[in-house]
């Protein structure tokens, strides 16, 4: 490698910026949940989070992705604290952290215990009605 030049991948192209991986994940999640990707990844004063769904039981979603396939991801408490605070600011009743283990990998959703118990109760009531 010549000093002062960026390292190239095998095809000779520069690696994609981290933002492109995040954007791809956000668009896929928004499509899956029927939500809207927030402008500038929620960095504005009025639009918070990465994705917001609509309705009385709306969600504010914070997306986290790895830029290369990985067997693990480090979950940060600060992600939850920030998302919870943004829910309060926007009046959004529910929050979730969405993560994957690399580009084009399956997305996983982290919710709090209260919401999990609500989901479990709902699923059990559906089962009883069968």
Show the residue positions of the predicted features.
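Catalytic phosphate/metal-binding cores of nucleic-acid and nucleotide-processing enzymes, i.e., regions
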Residues: 1-130
């Amino acid at each position: 490698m010549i000093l002062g030049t960026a390292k190239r991948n095998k095809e000779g192209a520069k690696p994609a910026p981290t933002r492109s991986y995040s954007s791809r994940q956000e668009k896929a999640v928004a499509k899956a949940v029927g939500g809207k990707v927030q402008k500038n990844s929620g960095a504005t004063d009025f639009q918070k989070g990465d994705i917001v769904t609509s309705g009385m039981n709306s969600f504010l979603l914070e997306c986290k992705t790895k830029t290369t396939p990985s067997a693990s991801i480090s979950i940060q408490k600060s992600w939850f604290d920030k998302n919870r605070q943004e829910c309060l600011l926007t009046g959004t009743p529910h929050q979730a952290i969405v993560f994957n283990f690399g580009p084009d990998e399956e997305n996983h959703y982290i919710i709090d215990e209260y919401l999990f118990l609500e989901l479990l109760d709902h699923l059990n009531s559906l089962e009883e009605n069968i």
